Amino acid sequence: MSDTRPLALLLMGPTAAGKTDLAIALRERLGGELISVDSAMIYRGMDIGTAKPSAQELARAPHRLIDIRDPAETYSAAEFRDDALAEMRDISSQGRTPILVGGTMMYIKRLIDGVASLPARDPALREALNARAESEGLVALHRELSRVDPVAAETIHPHNRQRLLRALEVYQLTGRALGELWAEQARETFPWRLVSIALAPNARHVLHARIAERFDSMLAAGFRDEVAALQARGDLHRGLPAIRCVGYRQMWEHLRGETDAATMRERGLAATRQLAKRQLTWLRGWEGVHWIDSDASDAHEQVLKIVRGSST
């Protein structure tokens, strides 16, 4: 029996793989509309360090779910799921194809798998956990999470304060692991026929070279001034998800006089390479993904062939 669900394309890949360029080309070939799946591009005023599409690119191919939050605000995977589904329904209702593009794997997982029913935040408990984070350090709390919820600990970086504290909060409120609660939720059939593409260079050294080239281009384009403007606001701090974004955290520390320029660059590159490694690890475990070499001159033709084949 043929699948009658509307088509949606999911274009994933590590940072600096070239997803934006391919997505714009596919939008024109498929008659689609782009939806950003990037937890950094949601923030207004954070353009250079997030490699946000340029004004010219956005005029040619608008991206939904870009510039939807102030850097002082938070945005959960559950909120992303609600927003993305609404955008996908709107695009499909116009007879066009939703093209989701980005590398925030937690957003993608929550979009497809759904969001577990979790207890509401407990202000008193969160305050206590924040105090422990300050006194004991995030690494110590991550070790604790590894003992009580190894599944969640595997997916949460030790320095991702927001997600780390939330996982511990859920465990202390329910006595159950996040992974257990996720596994219990009923998985509904996703309303779209989803074609999943992973874009990445075949060689790691090629990706690392691109990461370095892009980081240096950001510095030349005024990344330092962009972060300085964020600091000058006075209401932002390094505990916020926006300021913890790769590159922003390292530049923030540099502007506070904690590191010199060379150290900032070295740490920024290291953090970006670590992010790319985590993204690739996650993608290798993704069921049914089609891998495309980002260096292939016919990458968009390969994707179109995969899409056409998925409908038969």
From Swiss-Prot:
ATP binds at residues 13-20. GO terms for biological process: tRNA modification. Belongs to the IPP transferase family. Catalyzes the transfer of a dimethylallyl group onto the adenine at position 37 in tRNAs that read codons beginning with uridine, leading to the formation of N6-(dimethylallyl)adenosine (i(6)A). Residues 38-41, 162-166, 244-249 are annotated as: Interaction with substrate tRNA. Its EC number is 2.5.1.75. The gene is miaA. Keywords: ATP-binding, Magnesium, Nucleotide-binding, Transferase, tRNA processing. This is tRNA dimethylallyltransferase. Coiled coil: none annotated. The keyword Cell wall biogenesis/degradation does not apply. It is an enzyme of class 2 (transferase). SUPFAM superfamilies: P-loop containing nucleoside triphosphate hydrolases (SSF52540). The record marks 104, 126 as: Interaction with substrate tRNA. GO terms for molecular function: ATP binding; tRNA dimethylallyltransferase activity. Substrate binds at residues 15-20. It catalyses: adenosine(37) in tRNA + dimethylallyl diphosphate = N(6)-dimethylallyladenosine(37) in tRNA + diphosphate. Monomer. Signal peptide: none annotated.
